[in-house]
UniProtKB/Swiss-Prot annotation:
Stated name of the protein: Dihydroorotate dehydrogenase B (NAD(+)), electron transfer subunit
Protein species of origin: Geobacillus sp. (strain WCH70)
Annotated FAD-binding FR-type domain residues: 2-102
Pathway the protein acts in: Pyrimidine metabolism; UMP biosynthesis via de novo pathway; orotate from (S)-dihydroorotate (NAD(+) route): step 1/1
Keyword entries, A-Z: 2Fe-2S, Electron transport, FAD, Flavoprotein, Iron, Iron-sulfur, Metal-binding, Pyrimidine biosynthesis, Transport
Family the entry assigns: Belongs to the PyrK family.
GO molecular function: 2 iron, 2 sulfur cluster binding; electron transfer activity; flavin adenine dinucleotide binding; metal ion binding; oxidoreductase activity
Cofactor requirements of the protein: [2Fe-2S] cluster; FAD
Subunit structure: Heterotetramer of 2 PyrK and 2 PyrD type B subunits.
UniProt xrefs under Gene3D superfamilies: Dihydroorotate dehydrogenase, electron transfer subunit (2.10.240.10), Nucleotide-binding domain of ferredoxin-NADP reductase (FNR) module (3.40.50.80), Translation factors (2.40.30.10)
Record-listed [2Fe-2S] cluster binding positions: 221, 226, 229, 244
Length: 257
């Protein structure tokens, strides 16, 4: 159930160039169940910036009532957020969205997790929960360059993990699709989160596979009221789906990328 709470900053630190890891505590964590969901964060108590920032859930620890968010500092809002210190509070609304379908990967089957840039974080909690239910997990993570790579070691705890960088400074030179092709990675179900070109490439690469894609879109309200994050439905000029509440996770082919 969606709630709003002033959550407390437990830990906040940079983990790569302009990439921050933010741990929050509060009762809101008790409502967080599905990996792939997100929260809407108000970065300041002031009127400006007005809009909240959607941040995906990276880790969920309901016993400790703590959750971890990872974000990129790139604008006024996230720059203000990066200045928050332990002990301060942040206005958080959530959890929002549908999350990844865990039931799509059965015990003993193989799941391929593919993340691009800031689309990597929600796959961590997914990997953790899949491994817990006996699914064999392989992760392929793509970044622009070595200095923005994060969570390689953390994902490796759950299974084989491969890195691709566009400039070749770490791992395979190229894109996540290059790694999948070169390594001939086999899987039963694919989960991915990242920029649209990456998601579209995966959709085209595996037309006969079970593929779930988490979209990254700019959002206004986060609850389906403002229609700022709509995606077109195939074979229709008028039908749309909202990323914030119908998604952010869609089965491949469900929306036009």
């Amino acid at each position: 159930m969606m709630k709003q709470e002033q959550m407390t900053v437990v830990r906040h630190k940079p983990i790569a160039k302009n990439i921050y890891e933010l741990m929050l505590s509060g009762h809101l964590v008790e409502e967080m169940n599905a990996p792939g969901q997100f929260v809407h964060v108000k970065v300041t108590s002031q009127a400006d910036p007005l809009l909240r920032r959607p941040l995906s859930l990276c880790r969920i620890d309901q016993n400790a009532r703590e959750c971890t968010l990872i974000y990129r500092k790139e604008g006024i809002g996230t720059t203000l957020l990066s200045e928050k210190r332990p002990g301060e509070t942040i206005d958080v609304l959530g959890p929002l969205g549908n999350g990844f379908p865990l039931d799509a990967a059965q015990t003993g089957r193989r799941a391929l997790l593919v993340g691009g840039g800031i689309g990597v974080p929600p796959l961590y909690e997914l990997a953790k929960q899949l491994v817990k239910k006996g699914v064999i997990v392989t992760s392929v993570l793509g970044f622009q360059t070595k200095e923005v790579v994060f969570y390689e070691r953390e994902f490796a705890e759950f299974g084989e993990t491969y890195i691709a960088t566009v400039d070749g400074s770490h791992g395979t030179k190229g894109f996540v699709t290059d790694v999948i092709h070169e390594r001939a990675i086999s899987f039963d179900v694919l989960y991915a989160c990242g920029p649209k070109p990456m998601l579209k490439a995966l959709e085209q690469m595996f037309p006969d596979k079970e593929v779930y894609l988490s979209l990254e879109e700019r959002m206004g309200c986060g609850i389906g009221a403002c229609f700022a994050c709509v995606c077109r439905v195939p074979n229709s000029e008028t039908a749309y789906k909202k990323v914030c509440c119908d998604g952010p996770v869609f089965k491949a082919g469900e929306v036009v990328l």
